[in-house]
C-alpha cells in the first residue's frame, strides 16, 4: 500500500512541479493504431492453437472439453462469456504461472495467421468441391459435405496396403493421437465451438480410436467476423523536428471528421496510468489522482529549453531520480520519464548525483562493456541468460522464448529441481561447443607429411613467433610464420582421375611456399581382387621415392604419373612401373616390379590409412576429402570443378581469427608445439561420425509426459499421446550397466548418459548393435543402456526368442549381471540358450510387451520393423540404414560428444549444489532435465559480471511468488535513451505476466552535450484481451500521446517488427508535420499490416558464397509466380512479400533455374523434398520468418555464371511481367516489352503533404514536356493515404502508368533513426532490389524538382559503362563559396580533382548496376561508414561520391540541373531541370522559393487543385447517391465474392 501511495505522490510531484515556459493549454491527443488485413477470429480458437503449441494432447483434451460443455461455445451471448468459458476449460490443463502468458498471446493475436491459413485451405477446398456446408470433411481425394455423406464414405473400406497420399499435410496440422500412422486420412473442417462440430468429431474420434483413420482437424467458420484484427507489439515515436527550413504545406487544413476513438481525452488510461483502477484501489487519493490526470492531459505550449552545461549530467540525474524508488513503481516512473523525456528534462535537473552513484555507474558500465560488450546508450535484456538487443528484439519472438523457457521451468519444478539449483541449470549455456566444427586428431602415422614448416630449410627466413599472427596485413593475405598452424590433410584415391586436380593444387602450395603443411592419406577402399595390385603399387612407389629422395619428390612423382597417363585414365601398376623406371634410370623394370609387390619393404602404411579413414567416417569412396587442422571441409568443394583453392584460403582466414584470439589471450605461446595445441582443443574427437556430431536436423524425444500406470489396459495405452507413451515406457524401463556405471553426487547415484537401443535381435545387424552398446557399457563410466525390441518376428511366441529373453533379462536381472548374461547370448547366438530361473516368471508377459513396444517404435518413432535406432540422452541418432555401422567406438564418441556439449556442465552444477541433490534425484530425473534443457538451446546464454555494484544504481524486484518457479530477468539500460523507451514497457509487461526476479541496472552515458532523447514514445501492448461493458470485445490497443506540448513540430514514425510492412490507410493530417496549435484538435492515424516478409540468406553449397544475382520467386500452387527478388552478395540476403498461408519458393525460370537447383533449406515451417524444384514455406505467425537456403550448380554448369554478358533473359516472366500493373492495363508481356523499348521509368520519393504536393507538380511538369510514355515508381513506405488515393485519378487525367514499390530496410544493415535519413538511404542503397528485374534503366527525380525538357534525352544517354550518371554541383554562384564543403578537407583530397555530384537527378543503368554488384558495394561501404554518426551527413549523395573510385559516376552536363542556391542566374534559362535546393544562407521555405523562382509553378499548382476539387465533388456526389440507394431497401443482403488476390494499380 505504501508503495502505491509513493507511486501516486511521486508522479504528482513530477507532473505538478514541472516548470513551465508559458501558459498551459488543453493538449489534444495523438493516436495511432495498426490493423491486420485479416479479420478477427474467435478467441477460443486462439486458445486452442496456444495449447497445440504446448502439446498435441492438450489441444485434443481442450477439444474434448469444448464438445462436452453444457452450452455450445458459439451460442454464448457475448464474447466475454465465450472467452471465460474457454479459459475455465484450460485451467485444468495449464498451470497457474502459464495462464497470464496464454492471456497475453491471445491478446496479441499472434496465432491468428495460422488460423487464417486453416481458413484459406478450407475455402480453396470448399469452393473447388461445391460444398454448401461450412462444416465438411475431406476423405482422401473426396469431399463429404454432410454428416450422412461422411458416414457412407467411411463405410467403404480402403484397399488393403494402399496408402492415402491424396491429402497434403502441414506442420501445423492437428492429428488425433494414436492415428498418425493409419492409412486412411480424414480432414475435418469445422468450428469446434459449433454444435455441428460435435456430431462430426464424435464419429471421427471413434473411427480414429478403432485404428481405421488418421483424423486431422482444421478450423473453419460458418460466419466470419468483419472487424480487422487489431495488432500490438510495436512502438510509435514522435520526433521533435527541426524548423530550420519550413516543411509544412500551406494548404487549408482538412476536417478530421469523426474518429473511431471519440472522446479520447476522456479515456481513463492516460500516459500509461489507468486512473479508473487507481481510484478503485486508492479511494483516499481520488482528488490527487484527478489533479494528476488533469495535469497529464494539459501540455505546455513549449518544451523548456536547457543551457548547454545543463545537458551534462542529464542521464545520471535520470538514474538518480529512478533509483530513489524501489518496487514495481520504479518501472512506471521510468516509463513515464523515458517516454516523455523532452518534457521532463528540466525537472530532472533538481536531482542530485551523489559521488557513490557516479562511481558505481562508472564501475558497472566498464564491467558490462568488458564482459558483455554492452555500453550506453545501448540497452540489453537478459532472460535466464538469453540476450535480447533492445534495438532489434520484437515482442512476438520474445514471447516464443518465454513460452519455451516456461516449459523448462515447469519441467524442473515438476521434477523437484528448484531454488538455486534450478537457476543454475537454467543459466547454463549448452550451445558454445556446437558452434565449432568437430575435428579429428591428425597426429597419426597414417598421415604422410610432405613438408614441415617448422623444420624444412626453405622456410628458415620466416618469423618463428606466434605473435606475428597479430601483425596487421592487407586483407586476404596469409601470414607466413614458421609454425605448423595450418595443416592440410588430403585423403585421396591416388589412382582415380578425381584426385588429380587437388594433388596438383597441393603441389603448387608447396612449390610456392604457402604457409600450409601438407599431408596425404591414400584411400584404397575401392580395392578389389582385380585392382589390388595397383593400389599396393601406388603406395609402395610413393614410399620408395620418399625414402630415396624426399616427400616433396614423391608428391611430384604423383603429378608426373598424371601428366603421363592423361586426365581421365585410371592409373595402373604398369603406369607406375613405367614412370618409376623413367625417374630412376638405374632401376630395372623387374626390380621396380619387385619393390611394388605386396609385402615388399615399401609396402607399409596401408592398414594405418584404412583405420584412419574408418575413424573419419567419410562415406564417398573414391572422392577426395580434405581436413584443415583436422576439421573436414565440405566434400563438394574438394572437386576438380570447384574452386578448391578459394575454399581453402577462406577456411584458413577463419582459423587465423581463432588463432589470433588464442595468442592474444596467452593460450598459444612460442613455447607450445603448435600441432599439439591444435589437437588438444575440446572439439577434437577420437573419431568422426556425422550421425553423432552433426548439428543439422537434430531431433529430441519428448520425455516430459505423464506416465500411465496400468500397463494391462492396452486400449488406453494406444490412445496415449506420444509424449505420455514415452513417459510410460521410461517409467517401466530397466537398464544394463557395468562396474563403473554410476557415480555418487550428494545422496544420488547417477548415470549421466542414458542410451536406448532399438533393434531386432533376430537380425545380424540388430545383434551387432546391441553387442557394441553392451561392450561399451562394460568399459564406460556413468552410462546405462536399455534395449527396446523392434520386431514383428513370427518366432516371438517362442520362449527362446532372443528379443524376449534379452528384454526379460534386462527387466529382472541386476544391471551388471544382465550385461554379462546377454553378451554371452549375443556372441554365441546359434548355441542353445539355457534360460536362467530368474527369468521364468517374467517370460510369460514378454510376448505382449514386444507387441506394445513394436507399436511404440512404429507410432512414436516411425520405425519400420527390425529398423535400428540409437537414442542418447533423448536425442535421436538414426534410424540407421541397413549397411550402417555403429560400433563401440561410436558409442564412446557419443559419450565424449555428450560430455563436451552438456553433461560435464550439468555435472559441475550438481556438484556445486550437492546439498540439494537427494535420493529422489535419479538418472530418470537427469534424463528429463536433458529433454527439457537441450531442445531449447538455440541461443547462447550469458552470465552477468560477478563484480557488479548494486548500492546506488540497481533496482531489485523479487519474484511475486517465491514458492513457484521464476524467471531471472536482468535489464541493462540508460534511462535517458531510446533503448529505455522500448525496454521499459516490456519490463512492466514481464512483471505482469511472469513470476520473475528482475534486476534493473542503470548505466547512463556519463556526459552529454545535447538533449539525449529528442522524441516522445509509446509502446502498444495489452496483457489481456479487454471487453466492453456489454461483453463485446473492445476495439483493441492503440498508441496514445496526451499532454504533449502544442507548439513543437513533430514527425511520426512507427517502430514495427522487422518482418512487418505497414501502410498508412487513414490519416487526415500530415504525419510528417504535426503541430497541435495549428491543428487545434485530436490527430488520429490508422495503418494496415500489408505484408509479412519472408526473409532469408542464400548460399552456394559448394563454395559457401552467396550466389549473387540469383533470382527467386514466391507464389502459391495456383499462382506460382507472385513476387520475385534477387539474392544480394551482402550475406546472401533476400526478402519477399507474403501474407498468412502456404507458399512455394522457387528459382526463377531462366538462368537461375538453368544453372542452380535448391539443395537444402533450414528454417521453421519449411519443407523441401529431395530433388524437388520448390520449397514449401508456411507463413503462420506474426514473428519473423528467416530461412537459410542452399543451392547447388547443376551437373555441367560448374563454370556458368549468373551475371555473364549473355544475361538477356532478365526480362522473362515473373511477378513484374505476369501482372499488368500499369494504369492502362494490357497484357503483362506487352507491358514489359513496352517498358524495355519505349516507356521511361521515373523514380521518386516523398514524405509529408508538402513534398507530396511538390511531387505532383514535378510529375505534371515532366509529363507536359515528355512525348514518350512514362511510368512513375514511388516508394510506398512513406506516402500518405491522400496521395495514394489521388494517384489513380491523376494517372487517368494525365495518361501515365505508375507502380508503388516497397523494400524493408534489412535488419543486418545499420539502421538510421531519423526518418529523413532513412528516406535518403532508400534513394541509393536498394536500387538493385527495389525494382522489378525487367526494368533496365530508371531516372530519379527529386520531388521538389521542375522538369523543363523531354526527359527521354536523359533516358537515352550513353553512360559510357558507368552504372549511373549524376549532375555535379554548380560552382557559378560565388557568394556561396564558403558553404561548398566538397572543396575543402576530406572531400577535396578524396575526390582528387573530380567534382562532387548532387543527388536531385540521376539516371541508373540497372542492368549494369546489378552486373557489377554496385548495390552490394554501396551497402558494404555504407555499413562501414554509417557506424560513425559524423559520416555521411548527406547520405544519398555522400555515399556515391565517396565510392566514386569503386563505382564510377558519369558526370552529366551542368544544364541538366540548376538550383538557385549554387548556380548563377545566368544559367537559369538553359536549365533542363530546376531543383528547389535548401539555401543555408537564407533558410527560405520551399513553397516561397518555388513560387518566386519558377514562373510556371503556380499554374501547375492551380491545375492540380482544380483536378482535386473536381474529383472530390464527384466522390461526394457519388457518396450521396449511394446513401440514397442504401436507404431504399437495407433489408436485402448482398454477398460479394472478392478474389483472394486482386492487385491494385501498380502493387501486389
Swiss-Prot record:
The keyword ATP-binding does not apply. It comes from the Eukaryota. Residues 1227-1548 are annotated as: Glucosyltransferase. GO terms for cellular component: cytoplasm; endomembrane system; endoplasmic reticulum; endoplasmic reticulum lumen; endoplasmic reticulum-Golgi intermediate compartment; nuclear envelope; rough endoplasmic reticulum. Its EC number is 2.4.1.-. InterPro entries: Glyco_transf_24, Nucleotide-diphossugar_trans, UDP-g_GGtrans, UGGT_TRXL_1, UGGT_TRXL_2, UGGT_TRXL_3, UGGT_TRXL_4. Residues 1-22 form the signal peptide. Its main location: endoplasmic reticulum. GO terms for molecular function: UDP-glucose:glycoprotein glucosyltransferase activity; unfolded protein binding. Pathway: Protein modification; protein glycosylation. The keyword Iron does not apply. Recognizes glycoproteins with minor folding defects. Reglucosylates single N-glycans near the misfolded part of the protein, thus providing quality control for protein folding in the endoplasmic reticulum. Reglucosylated proteins are recognized by calreticulin for recycling to the endoplasmic reticulum and refolding or degradation. This is UDP-glucose:glycoprotein glucosyltransferase. It comes from Drosophila melanogaster (Fruit fly). The lineage of its organism: Eukaryota, Metazoa, Ecdysozoa, Arthropoda, Hexapoda.
